[in-house]
Design a protein with these regions (language model features):
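Class I SAM-dependent methyltransferase "Motif I" SAM/SAH-binding loop
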Residues: 64-68
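Conserved SAM/SAH-binding beta-strand->alpha-helix loop
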Residues: 89
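Conserved beta-strand signature within the Rossmann-like core of class I S-adenosyl-L-methionine
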Residues: 162-169
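Class I S-adenosyl-L-methionine
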Residues: 176-181, 185-214
């Protein structure tokens, strides 16, 4: 049911005991997975569109944007920014494009794997003004910690993109780990707090709010 979603269940009751070791390993060993050709092409295309339509505008990245509802929200609320929404699913992006009544000129939806897209941004020397990670897959099993973004070897590249970094989740442990990872890797403050927005930015957020999650 729409208003009956559950908080992720896990045997973990706190920050994963191996997360610090994982972070230290990733900090000392650059992630060298080869880029997929389709990700290179998608990145090059999005870079060309940004430079052609909004050169010099600060960039907001909406990673894992799904149907792009959050990207559309950001583009309308930050008209002086260029918003790039990235998702690996072509069908989700197509569904979002079809459902949008009006398409802002400062919005681009890109089909790509964010693991490659983040590294390509970093390699190109592009720095973000804002970066959103809205309700990423929490991978709640303790054995899946390395699949969470903060446990993934790409995490240092994500942090190198700078800007205001905002992550939302309905699992408190995910946010606690994310903040721990940011602090350990950057020596900068990161705070997790309860948040009840006036309007939902994503279908997941709408569902979680209807279920009373904070």
């Amino acid at each position: 049911m729409f208003g009956n979603s559950r908080v992720p269940e896990s045997v973990q009751g706190d920050i994963h005991p191996h997360l610090a070791t994982l972070l230290d390993r990733h900090a000392g060993a650059p992630f060298r997975k080869p880029y997929a050709d389709y990700n290179r092409a998608a990145f090059a295309g999005s870079l060309e569109r940004w430079q052609r339509t909004a050169a010099g505008s600060p960039v907001i990245l909406d990673s894992g944007c799904g149907v792009g509802e959050s990207s559309l929200y950001l583009a309308r609320n930050f008209p002086d920014h260029y918003v790039i929404g990235v998702d690996q699913s072509a069908s989700r992006l197509a569904r979002g494009r079809r459902s949008a009544a009006q398409w802002p000129p400062n919005l681009d939806l890109v089909r790509a794997d964010v693991v490659d897209y983040w590294r390509l941004l970093r390699e190109a020397g592009i720095r973000l003004d804002r970066h959103y990670l809205l309700y990423p897959n929490p991978w709640p099993k303790a054995s899946q910690v390395s699949r969470r973004w903060h446990g993934h070897p790409v995490f240092p590249s994500l942090l190198d993109l700078s800007g205001v970094l905002e992550c939302r989740s309905n699992w408190a442990i995910y946010l606690a780990e994310f903040c721990f990872a940011v602090r350990r890797m950057t020596q900068r403050p990161a705070v997790a707090e309860s948040y009840a927005p006036d309007a939902a930015m994503t279908p997941f957020e709408r569902k979680y709010l209807a279920s009373g999650h904070r």
